[in-house]
Amino acid sequence: MLSVLSYGRLVARAVIGGLSQTDSRDYSLVSASFGFGKDFRKGILKKGMCYGDDACFIARHRSADVLGVADGVGGWRDYGVDPSQFSGTLMRTCERLVKEGRFVPSNPVGILTTSYYELLQNKVPLLGSSTACIVVLDRQSHRLHTANLGDSGFLVVRGGEVVHRSDEQQHYFNTPFQLSIAPPEAEGSVLSDSPDAADSSSFDVQLGDIILTATDGLFDNMPDYMILQELKKLKNTNYESTQQTAKSIAEQAHVLAYDPNYMSPFAQFACDNGLNVRGGKPDDITVLLSIVAEYTD
């Protein structure tokens, strides 16, 4: 660690001359994704970046890097509705808005809100529900802006420790906050939250910080200490290493999800709510792994 006393001249010059060269550099995210559908088939299963009923996107704009995940609510399948259509369309709309520059980096809730209302105004009714988590890195300010609705989420790791994480939003056990579009005759009887209900946060990040964004299929099956163990294997900041680590994390969560004797975070949460449950939670799993790096064109 640099000593202020030892490097007083350097610090003084930086103050006198304005921002240092390090502070003036733009940041970016080196990001990779991996996931599993609940039906055991791994990889991208449907149009766009979808793993089962989960969906995600990674988008780059000159002002920011933006990524997101959404978990389609599977209960719609009982009514003949494909849950992946809602989550997939929501994420593709968010991605398009970013690429078109129709967003403000400091306002990820705005991305979610605009995308959701585009879906509401769709001429062809799109029924369904999903959770959503949006993460934005502002290149120049080096700040991360987040919006999380429901039980998907993110965590930021620095020096092997979790320094920031999203708060899970639940109405009650296993019923997360969610965006919904219901048929007119069912409006009022389908649980639906406003994008403005998303939990928002903003904070500075540093070069080398690791950002993991995922659906509940990961967090319900892997506690933080297991995730941190996998992240220790990440030695390089290139795409290949990031992709391999994302794959390793998703694969471990997938194995644990089908272990009947494993006391998963979901099982522990169920026990805390008076239910006698043990084992992993079979679910779609989506992992986006990102490393904060210096921006290059």
Curated annotation (Swiss-Prot):
One of its GO terms (molecular function) is protein serine/threonine phosphatase activity. Residues 1-27 form a transit peptide. It comes from Danio rerio. Coiled coil: none annotated. This is Protein phosphatase PTC7 homolog. Mn(2+) 2 binds at D71, D216. Its main location: mitochondrion. Disulfide bonds: none annotated. Its cofactor is Mg(2+); Mn(2+).
